[in-house]
Amino acid sequence: MKKFLLEMLICPACLPEETELRADIMIEQAEDVVEATLRCPRCASIYPIQDGTAFLGPPSDQRERTPSKYETEPVLSSYLWSHYGDLLGDEQASSAYRQWASLMDGGSGAVLDVGSAVGRFAFEMSRKRDLVVGIDNSVAFIKAARELMANGRRKLALRQEGHLSREETLTLLEGWQTDRIEFIVADALALPFRSHSFSGLASLNIIDKVPLP
């Protein structure tokens, strides 16, 4: 996780109180936090940063949960195709994320992408804003988005028929500013950010995923 985001983070378990988290950093590389523990001085909740990925869901979300389909490779590959299929030259791919991003204001300030999934909207917005933070409660989605952010490419297996699939390599567009992007595992209903941290907000495909939108 990018180190400068630490000053924006608060404890989601203490909401609506905005309690700053204290960071115990074990490993950092340049301006990235690789391994750390974030502690709340008010309620003693602990939030880990592991291999660069920050886990900032409420403590109840960090307990062992029933396996979700959104953590499986077939669903992950399906989402990667739906977000980036046009970059693979697929004639059936959608340009929706590019069009949605074109409707957002540009300029200075940060944008929060709630329910970012595997990150296409955030990458599109990196051309227009100083900072884009994507959150999702799927660990697999966030790790895939961060892999694309860090490496600029990722392999995926696209199902053809039955159990048959073909491997493709997804490569990001050069114009996307990956130094302006971060992805965090978090809950849309318990956002771990200080008030007024963002001047723009997107919540695509989220309304049907929360109990009380």
Predicted regions and their residues:
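Conserved SAM/SAH-binding beta-strand->alpha-helix loop
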Residues: S138
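Conserved alpha-helix/loop element of class I SAM-dependent methyltransferases that forms part
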Residues: L87-G109
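A short, conserved alpha-helix within the catalytic core of class I
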Residues: V210-P213
